[in-house]
């Protein structure tokens, strides 16, 4: 299944100019990276159902990698996958790829065509979290894009923003917000969050709510996204 989705994605990438994808911070994960990210999860195979989240799902590569890993691990329960995606160019392929996953693996899926960051309430306060949808396993390759401090996404998450924020750490913070207790999140992100005043509030939020259990730094930027030029050093990180 994953190899078919990778093939479909490669065809899509070839059809969309790189500058257009760069404008939205889109960099699609290759198969080796997706499989490695999925391998970091310690799945609880005893649960009768598992809820997965892929925010900014793109063509569904990471979702497929997690599903593949679950099936290979012998999981026989129900799998519920939620994907957020708003790119009209990508959506038809995402739907097609998830239909393939449904046919081959029997998953249930939902595609939410809404802004992941502004469509739900983000508050660093449990009193505001009663209606938050929570997930067992969250995987993500968020967009790498600086936004103005006046952007609606920044205004929706003021407690983690300072100065000029980047979408990737806002996605990451919201992912932590959507994570069930003692569950796991694996993201691929730039290394820039580790230092600097712009990321201080996010780091405080991260270490208040999570523990970092795994971190992988790539030797070469070229190994992460096939055929893409990513200037920032990139890491894969797992928290719970």
Feature map (PLM): residue ranges:
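Surface-exposed beta-strand-to-loop junctions
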Residues: 13-18, 74, 152-153
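Generic structural signal for well-ordered alpha-helical scaffold segments
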Residues: 38-43, 67, 71, 176
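Conserved S-adenosyl-L-methionine
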Residues: 68-80
């Amino acid at each position: 299944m994953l190899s078919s989705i990778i093939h479909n994605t490669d065809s899509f990438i070839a059809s969309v100019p790189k500058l257009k994808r760069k404008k939205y911070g889109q960099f699609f994960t290759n198969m080796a990276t997706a499989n490695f990210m999925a391998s970091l999860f310690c799945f609880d195979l005893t649960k009768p159902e598992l809820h997965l989240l892929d925010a900014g799902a793109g063509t569904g590569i990471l979702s497929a990698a997690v599903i593949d890993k679950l099936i290979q691990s012998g999981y026989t329960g129900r799998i519920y996958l939620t994907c957020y995606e708003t790119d009209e160019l990508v959506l038809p392929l995402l739907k097609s790829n998830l239909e393939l996953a449904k046919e081959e693996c029997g998953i249930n899926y939902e595609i939410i065509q809404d802004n992941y960051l502004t469509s739900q309430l983000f508050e660093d306060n449990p009193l505001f979290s009663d209606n938050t949808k929570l997930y067992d396993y969250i995987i993500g390759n968020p967009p790498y894009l600086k936004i103005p401090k006046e952007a609606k996404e920044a205004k929706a998450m003021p407690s983690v923003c300072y100065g000029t924020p980047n979408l990737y750490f806002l996605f990451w913070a919201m992912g932590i917000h959507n994570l069930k207790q003692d569950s796991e999140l694996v993201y691929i992100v730039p290394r820039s969050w580790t230092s600097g005043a712009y990321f201080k509030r996010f780091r405080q939020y991260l270490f208040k709510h999570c523990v970092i259990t795994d971190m992988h730094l790539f030797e070469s930027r070229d190994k992460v996204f096939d055929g893409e030029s990513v200037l920032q050093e990139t890491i894969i990180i797992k928290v719970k």
